[in-house]
Regions:
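A hydrophobic alpha-helical transmembrane-helix feature that marks the membrane cores
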Residues: 2-228
Length: 228
């Protein structure tokens, strides 16, 4: 009689076939579509929260200017915001409490920024300087984000470069405290602009390609790039 029983390794063969993209193209298309929908949702939530935090920062900066907070408040607010961003936000980013934390961080940074803007407003061409800085920052962010969104390129390779660059900038800033060289200050400012531009490309690319799935942490990264 013929042996009509199934081979013992039939289940393993079926599993291999199920993982074969040629045998099950619809499964891979479905997974790709799910990833795209998830990335688009994170991207939408990120930009909505980013817009809200920027508006809140602007409001707090206005309050800071109105009450004329001293310039040393900038350092205090940045230190407190950094501590919250490093130790508090990662622990709350997966809950609704994370939204409150991100608003607290951006509000503090807005207060500190307002104390610096107060000094610039006292200069002869202070308002023009501030308008140019804000306008340039907005154009750079929109341009780089638009490029990352339309090109859909993977800019994850910039991660190591940005980290190394930030270490160099921090060392240069510490050295310039003692050297007080105007040329070095200008070079540091230019380097920070380039590094923050790379950060915008890196963070936006991670959201698009599914590398960042938490919109609160994504908002925090993009906000810091704009703030700096």
């Amino acid at each position: 009689f013929c042996n009509l029983s199934y081979p013992k390794n039939r289940n393993s063969l079926l599993q291999q076939e199920s993982l074969d993209p040629m045998a099950n193209p619809n499964m891979y298309i479905s997974r790709g579509a799910e990833r795209a929908v998830s990335s688009n949702k994170v991207l939408k939530n990120t930009y909505m929260l980013l817009s809200a935090t920027l508006a809140f920062s602007a409001l707090m900066a206005g309050v800071s200017i109105a009450v004329a907070l001293p310039s040393w408040m900038y350092l205090v607010s940045v230190i407190v915001a950094m501590v919250m961003g490093i130790f508090v936000l990662p622990r709350t980013a997966n809950s609704s409490a994370g939204i409150g934390v991100i608003f607290a961080i951006t509000g503090l940074l807005g207060l500190g920024l307002g104390s610096i803007l107060t000094m610039y407003l006292a200069l002869p061409k202070g308002p023009e300087i501030i308008a140019t800085a804000f306008g340039g920052t907005g154009l750079i962010f929109l341009g780089l984000s638009g490029y990352a969104l339309t090109s859909k390129r993977d800019f994850s390779f910039l991660g190591g470069f940005v980290f190394a660059g930030m270490m160099v900038v921090v060392i240069a800033m510490l050295a310039n405290i003692f050297l007080a060289m105007p040329a070095l200050s200008l070079a540091i400012s230019g380097a920070i602009i380039l590094l923050m531009s790379a950060f915008i490309l890196f963070d936006t690319s991670r959201i698009i390609n599914g590398g960042e799935t938490n919109y609160i942490m994504a908002t925090y990264g993009l906000y810091l790039s704009i703030f700096n």
